[in-house]
Curated annotation (Swiss-Prot):
One of its GO terms (cellular component) is cytosol. It catalyses: an ultra-long-chain mono-unsaturated fatty acyl-[ACP] + malonyl-[ACP] + H(+) = a 3-oxo-ultra-long-chain mono-unsaturated fatty acyl-[ACP] + holo-[ACP] + CO2. Its main location: cytoplasm. The gene is kasA. This is 3-oxoacyl-[acyl-carrier-protein] synthase 1. InterPro entries: Beta-ketoacyl_synthase, Ketoacyl_synth_C, Ketoacyl_synth_N, PKS_Beta-ketoAc_synthase_dom, Thiolase-like. The active site is at C171, H311, H345. Residues 11-415 form the Ketosynthase family 3 (KS3) domain.
Length: 416
């Protein structure tokens, strides 16, 4: 029995027709892309009051170039969590960029992942209750705290009735959202989907928590050089704020409305390590299986893969495990790019952001340079794109996302 795939017509052809993002380099995706190609970094010294108040060991990160709240009304600020406000902003931009199309609500789905959701509202509500009792807690607290609030905001704003979902799978949440949206479409439950990931701002508690795990870089005197994916001297990740969404739909639906596809979404693989709560399995076997599964569903072989957009957090164990995963999947010939070297780590949003960058690499036939890759690690024998952008005839690419809890997600994209 032949395994169904996109290539053999077993699944409908799914295309990406619009993308949007806000990052520490620029509030729009095209300017972010140009900045990455030019070797820009969004990582700087943090000047927030909490850095000195708590004398945090990490004093660097990447705040959004343009604050989300500068686009919000007083009512939005009062009734929405931060991730809900980000979702509202990005979904509005995405929909406008695609011409605000008329779609059948019953064939329209939304999947938006996040790592923590509206966690800041839990702290605020607790402080209010501590100071004045339960009556001080807002009746809007529940809708702001619930992790599915960001996806629900998009579903309400755009009128999606084919399901609204919220993957909460740590650093793979954004990619898993795209995977589930693709599944909704190929299973016949939807024709079009808004999908991606959002995350809250850099705050003191996440810095403290991840620092205590020794997962973060402490190169405070060299912020732009701190995130060093796959480099022998890497010492941890750096936070970088971001959010990203994309519009995917069947090729038939896109053609019917006159949309111009940016790329194809060919397959999605999801596995889990069943190894450790926060450490990846060093052998990369299950992560590599996610990559292989995405290719099987796409109808591709490992040798077809021209480019891997790596999860590449710059942690010693994480990058080694990913290198092993790429070898397990047989994709070691692919040109590898690690965007966190320039943009930092945005947790629940990062998989979506890096998926968008993968789409743009295929669209333009160019891969940005991985910053700070200076001393190759002999244990990581990969073709890391560094120094300058690399132009080429890129047909197929995989985006990797791996998260605490042993979550592994790989998305296979193709040039349109």
């Amino acid at each position: 029995m032949t395994m169904p795939s996109t290539a053999n017509g077993g699944f409908p052809s799914v295309v990406v027709t619009a993308v949007t993002a806000t990052t520490s380099i620029s509030p729009d995706i095209e300017s972010t892309w140009k900045g990455l190609l030019a070797g820009e970094s969004g990582i700087h010294v943090l000047e927030d009051e909490y850095i000195t108040k708590w004398d945090l060991p990490v004093k660097i990160g990447g705040h959004l170039k343009e604050p989300v709240d500068s686009h919000m009304s007083r009512l939005d600020l009062r009734r929405m969590s931060y991730v809900q406000r980000m979702s509202k902003l990005l979904s509005g931009r995405l929909w406008e960029s695609t011409g605000s199309p008329e779609v059948d609500p019953d064939r329209f789905t939304v999947v938006v992942g996040t790592g923590l959701g509206g966690a800041e509202r839990i702290v605020e509500s607790y402080d209010l209750m501590n100071a004045g009792g339960p009556r001080k807690v807002s009746p809007l607290a529940v809708q702001m705290i619930m992790p599915n609030g960001a996806a629900a905001t998009v579903g309400l704003q755009l009128g999606a009735c084919a399901g609204v979902m919220t993957p909460v799978s740590a650093c793979s949440s954004g990619s898993e959202a795209i995977a589930h949206a693709w599944r909704q479409i190929i299973m016949g439950d939807a024709d079009v989907a808004v999908c991606g990931g959002v995350e809250g701002p850099i705050e003191a508690l996440p810095i403290a928590a991840f620092s205590m795990m020794r997962a973060m870089s402490t190169r405070n005197d060299d912020p732009e050089g701190a995130s060093r994916p796959f480099d022998k001297n890497r010492d941890g990740f750096v936070f970088g704020e971001a959010g990203a969404l994309m519009l995917i739909e069947t090729e038939e639906h896109a053609k019917a409305r006159g949309a111009k596809p940016l790329a194809r979404l060919l397959g999605a693989g999801i596995t889990s390590d069943a190894f450790h709560m926060v450490a990846p399995a060093a052998d990369g076997v299950r992560a590599g299986r996610a990559m292989t599964r995405s290719l099987e569903l796409a109808g591709l072989s490992a040798k077809d893969v021209d480019h891997v957009n790596a999860h590449g957090t710059a942690t010693p164990i994480g990058d080694s495990a990913e290198a092993n995963a790429i070898r397990v999947a047989g994709c070691e010939q692919a040109a590898v790019y690690a965007p966190k070297s320039a943009l930092g780590h945005s947790i629940g949003a990062v998989g979506a952001l890096e998926s968008v960058l993968t789409v743009l690499a295929l669209r333009d036939g160019v891969i940005p340079p991985t910053l700070n890759y200076q001393t190759p690690d002999p244990e990581i024998d990969l073709d890391i794109v560094a120094g300058e952008p690399r132009y080429g005839d890129y047909r197929y690419a995989i985006n990797n996302s791996f998260g605490f809890g042993g979550h592994n997600v790989a998305l296979a994209f193709g040039r349109y």
